[in-house]
Amino acid sequence: MNVKYNSEKPKKSKKIKLFNLSNEQLTRHKSLNKMNNSEKENINSINIQNNTQNEKNKLKQSDLDFAFYKDLTSKSYADDFSGSCGYTFTIFRSINEIFYLIFASIEKSIMSYDIKNNQKICEIKNAHNNYIIDFRHFYDKKNKRDLLISVSSFDNNIKLWNIYNWTCILEIKNANRTGALYSASFLCENNEIYIISSNSNLLKRKDPIKIFNLNGAIIKQIKFSNSIDFIDCYYEINNIYIILGTHNNVISYDYTNNKMYNNYGKYGQTKGHYTGIIVHNSKLIASNFGGIIEICDFHTGEVLNEINMSICSGFLGVCLWDENNLLVGCTDRTIKLINLKEKKLKKCFYGHKYFVATVKKIYIPKIGDCFISQGMTSDTIKLWTVKK
């Protein structure tokens, strides 16, 4: 395996001092008591102006919009399986303050890119024997390190990487014996980290979901009759839930108590399989290939909200921007901004050549909040910023 590094070292980011607001409020309160009436009236008028400005800011926030910033790379590749299975790239801020973008090339290499300093870090050539369709990052708090796993579809292997020197720490061969592995994720229990892999019933063998320790040994298997395209974990209070995306529905499994937890979604069989899944604040948001978004109560399974845009396009990757706004990668080569509260399509963003597989949000110093999108096949990875 050849690892090719960029010789330039990324610049260190400047530390930002945080202002102690509570001390300022205390000082201001004491000074107000010493003011005469006219001075207090002036302060009150300033407060009214500030409140008016705050209302304007809220109004601006409701008119959320984005602008194309730049193409990060034109060398990325996302296999057709990727958009409905996992994350075709990952972005994260590492412990050593590098803003990583990790993606795959058509040559089955893993590419590492520093977003903040706009430079390539390294390339791992021939990282897998087949197209890489899923990346996951995890911060190991116990050992204070960043971990990365990559999943390839038909070489059936999972690899765990050290991102600081780009060596393969662990290779799990034949993680799924049916010949296709679509998705894998990290599972953390009592500060111990495990790798959990999806199954696939292409050959109708009904392989179980497998959980491996970081030595590659299987510690647990969970049997499912469904073929799993997407897998992830959701943590709430003292419970760990495994989130499973299938062609027909979304399933949650209570890992802590070893039992099935819930079923979500009612359109999988008639409107296309589920392609994007997020769990946030006890709500599960799922999009499907038929252009429908369902928002469900995670614990009861009840559908709280439904947005049908099947006349526009099919949906792939989803990204929750804030409590009210969702970004969705679509089959019509756009990213759509949807207001969940109003159930309305607010904006469409153009520029990709093919289906948009994955959309993710990140904060980058000097740029601010932004999102990154990737199209399937040999498309670009694009960076978008908030319009001010």
Residue ranges and their predicted role:
Residues 101-105, 148-153, 195-203, 242-245, ...:
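Conserved beta-strand element within WD40/beta-propeller blades
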Residues 64-73, 112-122, 160-179, 204-220, ...:
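Per-blade loop-tip surfaces of WD-repeat and WD-like beta-propellers in eukaryotic adaptors/scaffolds
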Residues 107-111, 154-158, 201-209, 248-251, ...:
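Short coil/turn segments within WD40 beta-propeller repeats
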